[in-house]
Amino acid sequence: MLPRGRPRALGAAALLLLLLLLGFLLFGGDLGCERREPGGRAGAPGCFPGPLMPRVPPDGRLRRAAALDGDPGAGPGDHNRSDCGPQPPPPPKCELLHVAIVCAGHNSSRDVITLVKSMLFYRKNPLHLHLVTDAVARNILETLFHTWMVPAVRVSFYHADQLKPQVSWIPNKHYSGLYGLMKLVLPSALPAELARVIVLDTDVTFASDISELWALFAHFSDTQAIGLVENQSDWYLGNLWKNHRPWPALGRGFNTGVILLRLDRLRQAGWEQMWRLTARRELLSLPATSLADQDIFNAVIKEHPGLVQRLPCVWNVQLSDHTLAERCYSEASDLKVIHWNSPKKLRVKNKHVEFFRNFYLTFLEYDGNLLRRELFVCPSQPPPGAEQLQQALAQLDEEDPCFEFRQQQLTVHRVHVTFLPHEPPPPRPHDVTLVAQLSMDRLQMLEALCRHWPGPMSLALYLTDAEAQQFLHFVEASPVLAARQDVAYHVVYREGPLYPVNQLRNVALAQALTPYVFLSDIDFLPAYSLYDYLRASIEQLGLGSRRKAALVVPAFETLRYRFSFPHSKVELLALLDAGTLYTFRYHEWPRGHAPTDYARWREAQAPYRVQWAANYEPYVVVPRDCPRYDPRFVGFGWNKVAHIVELDAQEYELLVLPEAFTIHLPHAPSLDISRFRSSPTYRDCLQALKDEFHQDLSRHHGAAALKYLPALQQPQSPARG
């Protein structure tokens, strides 16, 4: 006999089993879609919504209450519906995915980096980036990718200037100018053997693995060659304002911020002749394109609708001024690509803009160094120098007391040259660029430096990705800095515990464009007249190929945060006599500048020659092709001294200028100075670097290097600095 209550329990269990079976029969299709979704996530965009599914049909077009108002193409046959049909399989694990981007100028280059970060964060496949760039963007991005050393990423560059004649005949009102038309010529510009490519605008951000987008090529019919998301505004309906006359489009038209191109089919179909004929015909009645290449793509698709494959709306969520994208993202559980296609970019008016802005800022400020780590293994050519670097790192001993120094020397820092818009100075035979380096805690020096030095500057900044954005806002908010287009800022991204001072100097020095450079430090303010005086002195002394010399600019310092900066040598000497100024490091490290002979400088009327002496580290003006700084010296100590030793070994004259001066302003000691003062191990490691430096000096200069041996053997005093 069953215990009381057992029949009731068995009945309940049977009822539950029946309900589960019924649920499986009802929702099995949805579960099947989840299993077939590329990338393995629940929520395939091609499935009808179940309880846990996104409400985005296979083409991304929203129906019923969620449909776009006034949608002229809402018929069931217009949307490429698969009704939960088979989802495209993901591409093979190691298939190379091709991505094309048109990029021109400084600002667009910064946008590309954020886009690439978002792609790299999610990607599981090797990538080949095809970048159509102007000279400015190529210089920036070539340097960046070379120093980034991301595994399984290839980059090819194409000269935008060579493509301009193919589109320059098209009048265009869009802010992107001619570059906004260059996607039209990609089938002929990219290699003939390239059959498929994803084309992206610089203002898109990925929220998913790009291989899922690549997988949508499998949806193409035999005749389709262009994959696009429908335009998420009423622009092509012509009802945004009175007398608005857009280019012809199929229904709402399509947005070209994200494109899948079957290049092979477009070439076979005669794409170049097709878009040219269409554009010429439409321009007979329309004055210009308003949305650049997008207008012409839409006009061609209107005439040849069989070319287009509609993509789900989540692959191009458009945040334009008149966007209706909310109808897409409010129904979707898994957005794929965010597109800031308003000229206002992050300042566009949208009630959900904070959500999208924060998502964008995540990648804008994301540490790009973390993307160097390869989380998947695919056979690919390693970045140049990567194998040698890994071998050198593998030989380091983590138990070595100087391990930090050794590791920092081998670190390859990401470098973003000309981070902000920069206009190179017009060529002048005796022009001088001020070269310096700084970190975030010295930004406050920039405005004063710009007031003191009216000439070109090349400055290297050691920043994190997040600090780089703070720096950008700092410059934009400063009328003094924003007005100076002749100041080139180069961001070297922070990595490692020690300050790579000489690597920073070399970056700034390499980017100087004038024949001569003034090698300074950020804590110094030069005399107001120094720029003009240096150019005149270079000409008078006949420097250049006839005479190899380093012009010494005498250095002074003040311990006061506020003082009246001298406008002449006479005023400076008065402040020196009054005790307001001192010769630089007179109290702590007089050997560093004693050879300048300040007593002689007081009376000098003409340049005079001085001899090198141990620990001499003056600030000098030299030709741009001077020896580079020794990058082994990181942190504090001997970084400038070693450079002056090299100049002397290469027989540079040291000439002190009688009317030149620069003044050091007080500041809190850096972390590296503090470590130098407090740590005997730090000083021992510095001595080891000095010994290695002399060995290399002897190999290069032979017996002539013996004169520097006593200086190199002197121990470093912890009181220095």
Swiss-Prot record:
Q: Which residues are glycosylated?
A: N80, N107, N231
Ranges per topology, Lumenal:
30-721
Q: Where in the cell is it found?
A: Golgi apparatus membrane
Q: Which InterPro entries match?
A: Glyco_trans_8, Nucleotide-diphossugar_trans, Xyl/GlcA_transferase
Q: Which GO terms describe its molecular function?
A: glucuronosyltransferase activity; manganese ion binding; UDP-xylosyltransferase activity; xylosyltransferase activity
User: Is Membrane among the key words of this record?
Assistant: yes
Cofactors that this protein relies on: Mn(2+)
Nucleus as a keyword?
no
Chain intervals for the UniProt region annotation (Disordered): 59-89
Q: Where is this region: Glucuronyltransferase activity?
A: 373-715
Q: Which Pfam families match?
A: Glyco_transf_49 (PF13896), Glyco_transf_8 (PF01501)
Main localisation:
Golgi
Q: Which residues lie on this side of the membrane: Cytoplasmic?
A: 1-8
Q: Quick one: a GO biological-process term for this protein? A: protein O-linked glycosylation
Q: How does it sit in the membrane?
A: Single-pass type II membrane protein
Which positions bind Mn(2+) 2? Answer: D521, D523
What EC number(s) does the entry state?
2.4.-.-, 2.4.2.-, 2.4.1.-
Q: Which tissues does the record link to its expression?
A: Widely expressed. Expressed at high level in placenta, pancreas and kidney compared to LARGE. Not expressed in brain.
User: What is written in the cofactor note of this entry?
Assistant: Binds 2 Mn(2+) ions per subunit. The xylosyltransferase part binds one Mn(2+) and the beta-1,3-glucuronyltransferase part binds one Mn(2+).
Q: How does it assemble?
A: Interacts with B4GAT1.
Q: Which PANTHER family match?
A: GLYCOSYLTRANSFERASE-RELATED, XYLOSYL- AND GLUCURONYLTRANSFERASE LARGE2
Q: Which family does it belong to?
A: In the C-terminal section; belongs to the glycosyltransferase 49 family. In the N-terminal section; belongs to the glycosyltransferase 8 family.
Name-wise, this protein is: Xylosyl- and glucuronyltransferase LARGE2
Designated gene of the protein:
LARGE2
